[in-house]
Amino acid sequence: MIDESPYRLQLWLYPLLLLTLCGSVQGDDMHLRDTFTGKPQERWRFVTDQVMGGVSTGNLRFEALQRQNFARMTGNVSTKNNGGFIQFRRQMTAVSGSNGVEIRVRGNGEKYFVHLRTSGTVLPWQYYQASFDTTDEWKTIRIPFRNFVGSSDWLSENVSPPSIRSLGIVAYGRDHQADIAVSMAGFF
C-alpha cells in the first residue's frame, strides 16, 4: 500500500500558497499608483459637504479616452451652511522612503487640493492638505510631504509616510465650479 499523505499535503498546500500570494498582491496595491484601471469605482468614493449640512453638489465618473483611463469629478462647490467641498478618495498607504504625492491631472484652471488622512487624523475634519493648480492640458504634479499642512494644531507637524491611510482629491474652500480629471494618483 502506498502512503498518500505527502500528496494530500501538497494538494492542500498549493491552494493555500496561491491564496497567500494573491492576498499579498492585493495588499501591495494599496500603496501602488492608481491608474484607474480595473474597477476603480470599487476603490474610490465620492463625498460632498452634505454629510455635514453643506449644499455642494457633484459627481464622479470613470472614463477612458485615447487609451487613458481617468476619474473625472465635476460639481458646484458652495460655502453656504458652513460647507465648501466635494472630493473623491481611496484608501492608500505610502511605503517608508516615499517623498510625496504624485498625480497626473487636467482641469478647468481652478486650484484643487490633495488631502491625506493618517493614523493620527481620527476626527472627520482632520487631514493634511496641499494645493495644486490645473490647466486644460494633462500634467504630472509632484508634491513633497513637507508641503502638506495639517488642518489643526492637534496634528503632528510632518506627515509620516507609513501612517498614511487615504488620499483624496478635493475641490475646497470657496464657491466655484469644479471640473478635474485624474489619470494617476500615488506616491513617489
Question: Residue ranges of each PLM-predicted region?
Answer:
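Short regulatory "switch" loops immediately downstream of catalytic or recognition motifs
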Residues: 1, 18, 151
